[in-house]
From Swiss-Prot:
SUPFAM superfamilies: Nucleotidylyl transferase, Ribokinase-like. The gene is hldE. Pathway: Nucleotide-sugar biosynthesis; ADP-L-glycero-beta-D-manno-heptose biosynthesis; ADP-L-glycero-beta-D-manno-heptose from D-glycero-beta-D-manno-heptose 7-phosphate: step 1/4; Nucleotide-sugar biosynthesis; ADP-L-glycero-beta-D-manno-heptose biosynthesis; ADP-L-glycero-beta-D-manno-heptose from D-glycero-beta-D-manno-heptose 7-phosphate: step 3/4. GO terms for biological process: ADP-L-glycero-beta-D-manno-heptose biosynthetic process. One of its GO terms (cellular component) is cytosol. This is Bifunctional protein HldE. It comes from Shewanella sp. (strain MR-4). GO terms for molecular function: ATP binding; heptose 7-phosphate kinase activity; heptose-1-phosphate adenylyltransferase activity; phosphotransferase activity, alcohol group as acceptor. Homodimer. PANTHER family: BIFUNCTIONAL PROTEIN HLDE.
Length: 476
């Protein structure tokens, strides 16, 4: 997906929540234990990674953001290992140390890239510990633009309503990765990011898309949230806000190896993007892409800016793009505009695709973020070009166009001109190749009336479908 990244280095974020150490024991399995019907793992690798709220902070730091981290830890060696882990990426933690509690540890045993078992070492922190942590964190609010509350229901985030209210009063956005069935604890938050299971634990089973939207808007009104982003695994994400249409973002993950930390990645990318000045739809698209990267890795992982740029480029051609119907395109276009993308549209027969076409389409795409190509169907090509045309049927012409890197959507139309479909879609920019006058371009008046632009691009001299056909026939 083509989404421009904001200046992450300008982002100032505070992460408060349940920190933990993710510990991995890794090795091969070659036999079954004689003591019980379980595999024997010969450990040859041990690795510690910051997890929970600490993983959120590391994700923000890896993207280039400035981050402060506050959490509860014990006075133990695990806390020391966790401190070293976050300091390695330049994060200086603000721990509140609790003498009689252990630092939370999740130990995973893996073999052949598969998790065999997880062992948890933890005790929930007391309510007064959470109150002290949140009070300590209030002093950091004046130095940040966004706060993330990373709640794993381990006791760090007990009753954060006063903290949320204070942050909002200071103009600081508050993002919450929620836990449990009581979202009233996060009353007044800017955005919450439940996964589908967490969402249904609060609102009940979701029976349809309309039901999801209705229940999400009910939560918005009840708890005074600005927005809810429901993460939906293979169905992507759905953003619901009070005063705008919903935004559905399809998943971008190609292979899923491990979902550990995917929720952390979503909220960290959201927080970094918003703190850097991105609008919410753009931030959601960035977060969705980041999540698609991290689930392709093993264990708790972070996503770098370079990985994110590469993933955004690779996302072209994913679900929702390519050859589409007019209705599908109308919906996709609505979603693109909600993400703040500039949409360019052109049209033509494209009977035999040649170098001139490719050059022209690259020029058109360079003028925006998305390119629509409307293609004359076979009957309209025959009316325009005469007997013997088209050489290639419309489905083949569209398939070739959809394979070009410059093209996002290809849609057929049956009229002699694309005026009707252009008037329906109303792109930000309508382009046409050749020596047309702007006032003569079909659909141009409608685009201009809607606040868009019309532009004429030049074709490469000496290259045309007609000339290619004549050259082929001359050689027969």
């Amino acid at each position: 997906m083509k989404v421009s990244l904001p200046a992450f280095e300008k982002a100032k974020v505070l992460v408060v929540g349940d920190v933990m150490l993710d510990r991995y024991w890794v090795g091969p399995t070659g036999r079954i234990s004689p003591e019980a019907p379980v595999p024997v793992v010969k450990i040859n690798q041990v690795e510690d990674r910051p997890g929970g709220a600490a993983n959120v902070a590391l994700n923000i730091a890896t993207l280039g953001g400035q981050v402060q981290l506050a959490g509860l830890v014990g006075e133990d060696d695990t806390a020391k290992a966790l401190t070293l882990g976050v300091q390695a990426l330049g994060v200086e933690p603000q721990w509140l140390k609790i003498a009689d509690k252990p630092t939370i540890t999740k130990l995973r045993v893996l073999s052949r890239n598969q998790q065999l078992i997880r062992l948890d070492f933890e005790e929930s922190f007391d309510k007064q510990d959470s109150a002290r942590l949140l009070k300590q964190s209030e002093a950091l609010l004046d130095s940040v633009d966004v706060v993330v509350l990373s709640d794993y229901a381990k006791g760090a985030i007990d009753k954060p309503q006063d903290f949320i209210a204070l942050a909002r009063a200071k103009g600081v956005k508050v993002l919450v990765d929620p836990k449990g069935s009581d979202f009233s604890r996060y009353h007044g938050a800017s955005l919450i990011t439940p996964n589908m299971s967490e969402f249904e634990a609060v609102v009940g089973a979701v029976t349809s898309e309309a039901d999801l939207l209705e229940k999400a808007r009910g939560l918005l009104n009840k708890h005074q949230f600005d927005a809810i982003l429901v993460t939906r695994s293979e169905k992507g994400m759905t953003l619901v806000t009070a005063n705008a249409p919903e935004l559905h973002i399809p998943t971008v993950a190609r292979e899923v190896y491990d979902v550990t930390g995917a929720g952390d990645t979503v909220i960290s990318a959201l927080a970094t993007s918003l703190a850097a000045g991105a609008e919410l739809p753009q931030a959601c698209a960035i977060a969705n892409t980041a999540a698609g990267v991290v689930v392709g890795k093993l264990g708790t992982s972070t996503v770098s800016r370079i990985e994110l740029i590469e993933a955004l480029a690779l996302h072209h051609g994913e679900s929702g793009f390519g050859v589409v119907s007019e209705d599908q395109l109308a919906y996709a276009l609505e979603q693109a505009k909600l993400r703040g993308e500039r949409v360019v549209m052109t049209n033509g027969c494209f009977d035999i695709l040649h170098a001139g076409h490719v050059s022209y389409l690259k020029q058109a795409k360079a003028l925006g973020d998305r390119l629509i190509v409307a293609v004359n169907d076979d009957a309209s090509v025959k009316r325009l070009k005469g007997e013997g045309r088209p050489v290639n049927q419309v489905d083949r012409r569209m398939a070739v166009l959809a394979g070009l890197a410059a093209v996002d959507w290809v849609v057929p139309f049956s009229e002699d001109t694309p005026q009707r479909i252009i008037a329906r879609l109303l792109p930000d920019l309508l382009v046409k190749g050749g020596d047309y006058k702007i006032e003569d371009i079909a659909g141009g008046a409608e685009v201009i009336a809607a606040g868009g632009q019309v532009q004429v691009l030049g074709f490469e001299d000496g290259i045309s479908t007609t000339a290619i056909i004549q050259n082929i026939m001359a050689k027969q």
